[in-house]
Amino acid sequence: MQQKTKLFLQALKYSIPHLGKCMQKQHLNHYNFADHYYNRIKLKKYHLTKCLQNKPKISELARNIPSRSFSCKDLQPVKQENEKPLPENMDAFEKVRTKLETQPQEEYEIINVEVKHGGFVYYQEGCCLVRSKDEEADNDNYEVLFNLEELKLDQPFIDCIRVAPDEKYVAAKIRTEDSEASTCVIIKLSDQPVMEASFPNVSSFEWVKDEEDEDVLFYTFQRNLRCHDVYRATFGDNKRNERFYTEKDPSYFVFLYLTKDSRFLTINIMNKTTSEVWLIDGLSPWDPPVLIQKRIHGVLYYVEHRDDELYILTNVGEPTEFKLMRTAADTPAIMNWDLFFTMKRNTKVIDLDMFKDHCVLFLKHSNLLYVNVIGLADDSVRSLKLPPWACGFIMDTNSDPKNCPFQLCSPIRPPKYYTYKFAEGKLFEETGHEDPITKTSRVLRLEAKSKDGKLVPMTVFHKTDSEDLQKKPLLVQVYGAYGIDLKMNFRPERRVLVDDGWILAYCHVRGGGELGLQWHADGRLTKKLNGLADLEACIKTLHGQGFSQPSLTTLTAFSAGGVLAGALCNSNPELLRAVTLEAPFLDVLNTMMDTTLPLTLEELEEWGNPSSDEKHKNYIKHYCPYQNIKPQHYPSIHITAYENDERVPLKGIVSYTEKLKEAIAEHAKDTGEGYQSPNIILDIQPGGNHVIEDSHKKITAQIKFLYEELGLDSTSVFEDLKKYLKF
């Protein structure tokens, strides 16, 4: 199924779900991004010359979508106050940053969205959509199908690829780094590939073949960050394009995917807590869809298919965690669902993959990774505990019924390949060079006791040869919203910090999803303060166990993680020296009371409805970062915001920054002469995408800020960063 279940589980929190097999990014509602782009850069030369030698023709019927442009002319970043003298090593920093920013563009390539179909592999090479024979996929021998520059977009990349069943057509969704707008192009495959059509603002899309051997493209249309409409289209001599489903409830969104065996196309209608699935027969796609189970508040379910049976991952029944059930495809209603497999307590289902004779579950149990292999013939279960250093899965595109490949990674260790072979019943590890980080660093699984006695898991990294950890700098990371896990995929800048002696601590607080659905439920709505208490307990526990001290402790958060980070700055600023926030959500109350914002209704079950519920309003007032700013000492804070971010509007971040500076100035006045005010920096970046690529400039600016605030020498760290960015 290649990530489809993972995307389903994440889509419970997302408003623009993107489907599996194409390894694309998922976009959250107002405030978060599920899978950042950290794994999308690799070292490889573009082949632009060859790419442009075979430019495809463009049909006159195809619609070119105009490019979007943005301007910062009317927006000025807030200046840094109380600037400190430049450190002696500033020349070294500037030199390295210049090197990073001026690396030849052709040396870096977006990791290909790669799809295997028939005897070909379809992927992006430079600025082009290409395909090559499977056995030649690693060579330069490929056929150019479409030049992305024809769309006149700024630095476009392919986000998803779908190939029609008989390879007459290929559809590709194309977008840019600085915008969430996308274009789906349809390419007719022939000796001279032609762009048949293009559709703007497509979210999910899938191909099926009808009874007359005609390819039918189903796709969802996104409007104002909402995805409510489903269309189907045909091409060639019998062109059609019609809308056949519209979701009327604005709190729900719609996305599509095929079951792994392509037997059914599923229409998934869902919000944060409830889902409904309709089936379209892959053999007769013009027939009306069949409802599996009408939406029931609080019941989530996802559907896969094998041998005329539906396998349903659902939270129905007790306990209210995900479990696997099955039923005959011709009797899909909930009263016919039979329990097939249950998860242990404190278990998160990360992904599910269906094979001919096996079902593979990728799990996180008590903050450790497992793979469960279920034999569908005899209901046998084989549970494999994965290496303790592993913190994240990367699912691999796979159509081989004999093997289940995947990758494991951690924030400081690049992905490593593993393959489970069903015949041998064993897990095989990629052989070759062993990463030295395995010997030079340690990973610890710790727990902190929160205010109410709940044990909160933490994942901690540090160098094995570090002496006196209490004197080492500490970087804490938090999220705690939407039931989404902290992102723990490989990040070169995190590895560089550990190499330079830093301690990294990932705090898996309530509101996230690390311990299952209940862990999320215990940190949303009127339980949001649990997440804040958890974060406070984690930092105090780390200090109590000898990991760093407040004067060397920093905190970082992205998007909705800004709620807990900002709240901690208000309630316990003495625990922190410096904070970095990226596209942070900081004004919960005013945002959730503004129903004109496109995603407010979809967010009600996460934050509450302060417009109609006084209890929710008063509770949000109690923790909202913007509402609780007061004259006191604050840690230094570096905020990165994006000019046209539709999910976290710039206006709210600017208001927060101004109010914070006023409070700091008032506190400084009351404190008197000699008080050293913290630095508050607002870095406004151009662009309208909530999911901005981690540029060298942004990474180096954030690390520079942390080193300066802690008074550390950053000479070596930037040289190391340059090296690791070439992984």
Swiss-Prot record:
Residues forming the catalytic site: S559, D645, H690
SUPFAM superfamilies, A to Z: alpha/beta-Hydrolases (SSF53474), Peptidase/esterase 'gauge' domain (SSF50993)
Subcellular localization: Cytoplasm, Cytosol; Golgi apparatus, trans-Golgi network; Cytoplasm, Cytoskeleton; Golgi apparatus
> Keyword Flavoprotein: yes or no?
no
Q: Which Pfam families match?
A: Peptidase_S9, Peptidase_S9_N
What task does this protein carry out? Serine peptidase whose precise substrate specificity remains unclear. Does not cleave peptides after a arginine or lysine residue. Regulates trans-Golgi network morphology and sorting by regulating the membrane binding of the AP-1 complex. May play a role in the regulation of synaptic vesicle exocytosis.
* Coiled-coil segments: none
Kindly give the InterPro entries that the UniProt entry links to this protein: AB_hydrolase_fold, Pept_S9A_N, Peptidase_S9_cat, Peptidase_S9A, Serine_Peptidase_S9A
EC numbers for this chain: 3.4.21.-
GO MF annotations in UniProt: peptidase activity; serine-type endopeptidase activity
Q: Which family does it belong to?
A: Belongs to the peptidase S9A family.
Subunit arrangement? Homodimer. Interacts with the AP-1 complex.
Q: Which GO terms describe its cellular component?
A: cytoskeleton; cytosol; nucleus; trans-Golgi network
Q: Which GO terms describe its biological process?
A: Golgi to plasma membrane protein transport; proteolysis; regulation of synaptic vesicle exocytosis; retrograde transport, endosome to Golgi
Question: Keywords, A to Z?
Answer: Cytoplasm, Cytoskeleton, Golgi apparatus, Hydrolase, Nucleus, Protease, Serine protease
Protein name as catalogued? Prolyl endopeptidase-like
Q: What class of enzyme is it?
A: hydrolase
